[in-house]
Design a protein with these regions (language model features):
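N-terminal secretory-pathway/extracellular module detecting exported/lumenal segments
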Residues: 16-126
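Sec-dependent N-terminal signal peptides
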Residues: 4-13
Length: 126
């Protein structure tokens, strides 16, 4: 029994066991979740993992299409801004087919607006 438990711990990463909470559902076409267990906070600035699931393939370039992204974002509750620090692109819904990782050295700060999906996340976290 211990070997079986160890097998599952090794096979599945800790992110699989994290508490992912939905904060956007656009008629099933796009669903966004945030990792509620691993939020880091310092002086009203939050670091959060966000997963986006698309019901359709989204073109990244002419050759590659993705269905899931996992982004690590910085959410500033004082300035009402967010920055994407890194993004991983997957072709499969169960986070398989990782084909590109983007890490942003100097991430651009973008202001939150009601039209932006992260506005809802800011309402929850801030």
């Amino acid at each position: 029994m211990k070997k079986l438990l160890l097998f599952f711990v090794v096979i599945f990463s800790t992110s699989c066991f994290a508490e992912w909470k939905m904060f956007v559902n656009r008629d099933g076409a796009v669903k966004l979740y945030y990792n509620a267990e691993n939020i880091e906070e310092k002086d009203d600035i939050y670091l959060v993992y966000v997963r986006s699931y698309f019901a359709f393939e989204v073109p990244l370039n002419q050759e590659q299409k993705y269905r899931v992204t996992e982004a690590f974002i910085e959410l500033d509750c004082i300035e009402s801004t967010y920055s994407t620090l890194k993004t991983d692109f997957y072709s499969g819904y169960n986070l398989t087919g990782l084909f590109e990782k983007k890490v942003f050295e100097n991430p651009e700060k973008k202001y939150l607006s009601r039209r932006n999906a992260y506005w809802r996340l800011a309402e929850i976290i801030c």
